Amino acid sequence: DLDHPTQALADALWLQERFPDGLQGRKIAVSWAYSPSYAKPLSVPQGLAMLLPRLGADVVVAHPPGYQLVDACLEAARSGAESAGGSFQLTDDMDAAFEGAHVVYPKSWGPYELMLQRVDANRSGDEARMAEIEQACLEQNSRYRDWICDERRMALTEGGDALYMHCLPADIGDEVTPGVMARHRFNVAREANKKVYVIMALLAAAKVPDLVERLSH
C-alpha cells in the first residue's frame, strides 16, 4: 500500500504531454475526497507525492484529520522536492490546495492508523474489535462529505478550470460532481490510456537487457 509505480508513471507521462515545458512551477493538488467506500488504498496519493516533486512540481497534499500518509513516503516526497527544485506541502484545507492549482487529483483513501488496527484485529480473530473499528471508520469518513471536487473548488484553480485527474473509477457524486467529471471525461480517459504504454515499457525494460541499444538502431 506504499506506492503505485505504474499509476504514478502513467500520470507523469500524461502530465508531460499536457505540459511539454515541464512541471517546474506547476502546482499540483493531490487531495483526499469523500467516498462511501472509505477503505481505498493510499498507494496512489503516495506514489504521486513521491514522484511528482522529483519532476519539479509544487505538490500540495490535502486531507482531513485522520487521513495522513505514511511517514516514510512523506520523507521521500520532501527529499525528492529538495533534490529537484520542486516543493511539497501538506494542508488540511481542500480549498487552499485547489487555489491556483494547475492540476487537481481528488480521490479517497483510507484512514491509515485505523486500517492498521483493523489488520491487527483481523489477525487475532477479534470480531468484536473488527466491528468497532468498522464503525469508527464509517463515522470518521462521514464527517467529511463536503470534501468533493465541485464547480466552486474548480473555480479556485488556475484559470478557473485546472486539469482534473483521477486513477479511475471515480465515485461521481461523492469524490467529484457529475458536471466536473463530464467536462473532463475525455482527459481522464486519455490519462488512463497512458498506463498501457507505461506497463509495456516496463515489461520491455525487464525482458530486454539491451533495450536502449536496440531502440537506437
Where do the language-model regions lie?
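Phosphate/diphosphate ligand-binding glycine-rich loop within oxidoreductases
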Residues: 1-17, 172
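Glycine-rich phosphate/diphosphate-binding loop of Rossmann-like nucleotide-binding domains
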Residues: 16-107, 112-127
